[in-house]
Amino acid sequence: MTTELFSQLRNATAASHRRLDAEIDVCGEGLTLDRYGSLLMRFHGIFSTLEPQLAAVRGLDELDFDLDLARCCRTGWLSEDLEVLGMSSRGILGIDESLHPHLVTAVPEALGCLYVIEGAGLGGQVIVPCVQRQLGLTAVHGCRFFAGHGLATGARWRRLGATADQYARRTNTHARIEQSAVDLFQTFLRWFSEDAHGNGIERRAVVGRAVQH
């Protein structure tokens, strides 16, 4: 069941969501290891700064949605996947951070971010079979980031939806939550459509390339 808040956020971010899906296009034909690695590096550049911020937001851990934000899971999963693609630990530490970091300091803004992040987790369940078919990677080997929380993904999404909706009603912060979700989509779009070094994302290769099966 979709909550009133999440319906509002879905409508507000629909256009950006479609643009980002088209930009990433993981399930499109012709996905290569180089391009897949470049996409993972881009995700790492955002999550490596965003997840610690979310974990540090005061009051967020008091909400009853049990998302275990302190573990910064997605950054760790991205690192695991990049290691499978042949990138060294030192190389992963040197990955560029997003040129447009999304700053999060309060609960409403954090909830807007979590809408985007946890929603992407739902999409990840569709992406894993695409990556496995084209690249031979699996949910536990090279595609850990997109596999996310696996079978628990749907329950996490519903729990977040109910909790965020209750919080927004109680604090009258619908507009702030919506703006944060919109802004984070824009952060992703900017970072995936530009390159600090002047090279297109299609041409950015991961160091190593050798995939250990």
Show the residue positions of the predicted features.
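Metal- and O2-centered redox machinery and metal/ROS homeostasis
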Residues: M1-H213
